[in-house]
């Protein structure tokens, strides 16, 4: 897989690429601000420089969100709908922002996954066993993702392209920008799955050096939370639940694919597995567990 930023379509900025980060109302920070006005939403515009050996994002300006009227006459007091055009004559641009700070870009797609079997129409925000809006920046160039297929045809979808994001996506978004991706799709029949893919029931990321398992507050929220799951998931998620799910998945992974006892698996998790917060902004919160392949260099390849 390859991922590349797209150049700006505005001829005034030919050859340049830009992205935006919205510190929005659904962000983890929103109700815990220090300075006035509180609450507030802030958009920061970044220029993406891909001209050198190391590619960077650098802030150009930011502005506080003020009510915006869309082309249909609807007033948006908050960032409640994607793609609302911003009238720059009524916002105050601050060009003195993040001076001399350059962020290495990590282009990736926040949404990649297949369709679940539990519902015909599914909210695209919460991720689950089928993948979806996982927002893991490690799913970039050269990565391999495995998803359990739940419906005929799989119905793979992709979107939510990011130039850079940290673990947690804390303020609600990454640097959102247009990307061009190249993908290869391979169907693995369930009865042929062995090694690290045996019995896979969740999204698994494989890189050259690591396996990354994905845990969620609810491993299958559509089944676990009942008829109102797509509403209830936003109020019932927690980091504790997501960590518990990631722990359980990694325990089984080590016991079944590496032949460890439960006691061995638990010890290894504590000393050799990195658990991290994938995201806390997508309804079904995520914890990832990273284990390096080099730990098993003395074992037969699986």
Where are these regions (language model features)?
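Short beta-strand elements
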Residues: 1, 185-187, 289-291
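Intrinsically disordered, low-complexity linker/loop segments enriched in Gly/Pro
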Residues: 2-140, 146
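A generic structural signal for short, non-catalytic loop/turn and secondary-structure boundary residues
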Residues: 96-98, 140, 176-178, 270, ...
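General structural feature for long, well-ordered alpha-helical segments within catalytic domains
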Residues: 135-141, 181, 239-242, 246-250, ...
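Short, Lys/Arg- and Gly-enriched loop/turn segments at beta-strand edges
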Residues: 2-14, 153-163, 278-281
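Amphipathic, heptad-repeat alpha-helical segments used for oligomerization and assembly
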Residues: 224-256
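Conserved mixed alpha/beta catalytic, RNA-binding, or beta-rich assembly cores of soluble enzyme
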Residues: 102-237
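TerminUS-proximal long segments
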Residues: 252-302
């Amino acid at each position: 897989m390859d991922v590349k930023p797209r150049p700006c379509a505005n001829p005034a900025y030919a050859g340049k690429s830009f992205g935006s980060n919205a510190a929005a109302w659904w962000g983890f920070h929103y109700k815990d601000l220090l300075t006035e006005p509180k609450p507030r939403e802030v958009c920061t515009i970044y220029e993406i420089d891909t001209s050198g050996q190391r590619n960077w994002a650098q802030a150009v300006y930011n502005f506080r969100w003020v009510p915006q009227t869309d082309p249909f006459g609807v007033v948006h007091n908050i960032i409640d709908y994607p793609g609302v055009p911003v009238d720059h004559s009524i916002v105050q641009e601050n060009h003195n922002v993040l001076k001399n700070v350059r962020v290495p870009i990590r282009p990736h797609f926040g949404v990649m996954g297949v369709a679940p079997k539990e519902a015909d129409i599914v909210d695209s925000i919460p991720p689950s066993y089928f993948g979806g809006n996982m927002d893991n920046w490690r799913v970039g160039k050269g990565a391999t993702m495995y998803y359990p297929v739940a419906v005929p045809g799989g119905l793979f979808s992709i979107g939510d392209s990011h130039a850079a994001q940290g673990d947690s996506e804390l303020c609600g978004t990454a640097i959102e920008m247009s990307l061009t991706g190249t993908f290869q799709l391979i169907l693995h029949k369930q009865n042929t799955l062995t090694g690290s893919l045996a019995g896979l029931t969740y999204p698994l990321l494989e890189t050259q050096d690591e396996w990354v398992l994905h845990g969620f507050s609810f491993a299958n929220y559509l089944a676990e939370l009942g008829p109102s799951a797509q509403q209830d998931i936003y109020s019932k998620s927690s980091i504790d639940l997501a960590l518990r799910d990631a722990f359980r998945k990694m325990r089984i992974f080590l016991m079944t694919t590496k032949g460890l006892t439960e006691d061995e698996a638990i010890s290894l998790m504590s000393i050799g597995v990195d658990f991290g917060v994938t995201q806390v902004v997508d309804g079904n919160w995520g914890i990832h567990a990273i284990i390096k392949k080099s730990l098993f260099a003395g074992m037969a390849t699986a």
